[in-house]
Design a protein with these regions (language model features):
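Acidic/histidine-rich catalytic neighborhood of metal-dependent amide-processing enzymes
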Residues: 124-205, 246-260, 264, 271-278, ...
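Active-site metal-coordination/substrate-binding segment of hydrolases
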Residues: 13, 81-159, 164, 184, ...
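N-terminal capping segment at the start of a domain
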Residues: 3-5, 11-41, 125, 313, ...
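Metal-dependent amide/peptide-bond hydrolase catalytic core
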Residues: 2, 230-398
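A non-catalytic alpha/beta surface segment that caps or lines the substrate-entry region
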Residues: 32-84
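Glycine/charged-rich beta-loop-alpha catalytic/anionic-binding loops adjacent to active sites
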Residues: 116-130, 213-217, 337, 369-373
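A short glycine/serine-rich beta->alpha loop
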Residues: 125-134, 171, 217-223, 374, ...
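Phosphate/diphosphate-binding glycine-rich loops and adjacent basic-rich segments that engage nucleotide
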Residues: 187-232
Length: 398
């Protein structure tokens, strides 16, 4: 069924929801998140409180914003579907801090030919001064529009729960998720991109922090004083990273090592890296590369090099394979919406990968958003509406 994409009333509601959400500044901060601040920015509360008010107005039940800025609500099954499985849908409220998400000025293009080759499509894009925020406000809009349908139209549907989370972009989106409120045995994140994407496999993700300790002395007497410059230790380490393991040289199922940020003085330097792979074996190989390079720089310079690894999230494929119902239900929903399934690996992670680790299998579905995290970001209204159709089809499945 295509109850949103073929209904002008609800497509207009979807567009209005999306435009309203992207105008709300809700950028997170990776720097603050790494310091333990949660949520990492105060503006995420503005988005949370807006959604709380809107969920309440829809007639959703048990609407709450937790003390950690998670928005939760549920809605009971219709009388004829009391025995159906409850389903949880999730989307994240924050936008990435790499490109500004403040004062977003969305541009509406009523001819999608140059974007989706569909003249009837409506495209929402940016004025090139900020990102758009389709990641993941397109997901929020798709969920909210589907909820508007089931709370106002007479229809048979299963019980539904929703969670809108903070700090997904910082990698901390599930750190304080209120699992005690969740009744559903499985869930879906609405945080994908291209039309038809259904993602059941993601990276194993680790971070590495490399600390370099040198020896400072007066620069005029550095030779006599035995200066060991941590700036040069850092540079030497970076120069030794294998080019064929960089993000810009990998694709598909290939993993990578990504240097993300660094700081340095003569006496000390710090480098943060991301390690990504679909297999634990390759992750171990990447860790080994880092350790060998650390030892090499230490031996060459006489300074001290230490490495700390931290697990961020794991590939969700194994857990989803153990729970076929969650995938079967969404595949059926795609077919009913006349959308071809494109089951591709996520070269990243979602809140769903963390939730899957916690025992709630959670694949990811598309939103119709493109060119994330950039000033060229854009969304297709027709595809966003299809995502909303699929949410409803999941809820209608007995």
């Amino acid at each position: 069924m295509n109850l949103i994409s073929e209904n002008q009333k609800y497509k207009t509601l979807l567009l209005n929801n999306f435009i309203r959400y992207v105008k709300i500044w809700s950028e997170s901060s990776g720097e603050q998140a790494e310091k333990g601040v949660f949520p990492s920015t105060p503006q995420q509360w503005d988005m949370a409180n807006t959604l709380k008010d809107e969920l309440t107005a829809l007639g959703m039940q048990n609407v709450t914003v937790t003390d950690k800025c998670y928005v939760y609500a549920n809605y009971p099954a219709s009388d004829d579907m009391q025995n159906s499985d409850s389903v949880l849908f999730l989307a994240h409220m924050d936008t990435v801090d790499e490109v500004s998400g403040k004062n977003v000025n969305p541009q509406i293009i009523n001819d999608g030919t140059n974007f989706t080759k569909d003249k009837t499509d409506t495209i929402i894009t940016t004025d090139k001064k900020t990102l758009l925020g389709g990641d993941d406000k397109a997901g929020i809009a798709a969920i909210m529009t589907a909820l508007a349908y089931i709370t106002s139209e007479k229809c048979s549907h299963s019980a539904v729960e929703v969670i809108f989370s903070p700090d997904e972009e910082t990698g901390h989106g599930m750190d304080f998720v209120p699992t005690e409120l969740i009744k559903s045995k499985y869930a879906y994140t609405v945080d994908g991109g291209d039309l038809g994407e259904m993602e059941t496999e993601c990276f194993n993700a680790w971070s590495a922090t490399v600390n370099f300790t040198g020896k400072a002395c007066h620069t005029g007497y550095a030779k006599k004083g035995g200066m060991i410059n941590a700036n040069l230790m850092l540079a030497s380490f970076l120069s030794k990273l294998p080019v064929n393991k960089m993000p810009q040289t990998t694709e598909g199922f290939e993993g990578f090592i990504a240097p993300m940020e660094s700081s340095a003085t003569i006496e000390s330097a710090t480098l943060n890296l991301l390690l990504r792979s679909f297999s634990n074996t390759e992750i171990d190989e990447e860790k080994n590369i880092i350790m060998k390079l650390a030892d090499k720089v230490k031996d060459e310079t006489g300074g001290l090099v230490t490495v700390t690894f931290k697990q961020q999230y794991l590939n969700m494929k194994e857990k989803l394979d153990e729970n076929p119902r969650v995938v079967e239900r969404v595949v059926k929903a795609f077919k009913e919406a006349n959308v071809n399934v494109v089951n591709s690996p996520i070269r990243g992670g979602t809140d769903g990968s963390r939730l899957t680790e916690m025992g709630i299998p959670t694949p990811n579905i598309f939103t119709g958003s493109y060119e994330f995290h950039s000033r060229n970001e854009w969304c297709s209204l027709n595809q966003m509406a299809k995502a909303s159709d699929i949410i409803l089809n999941i809820l209608f499945d007995k």
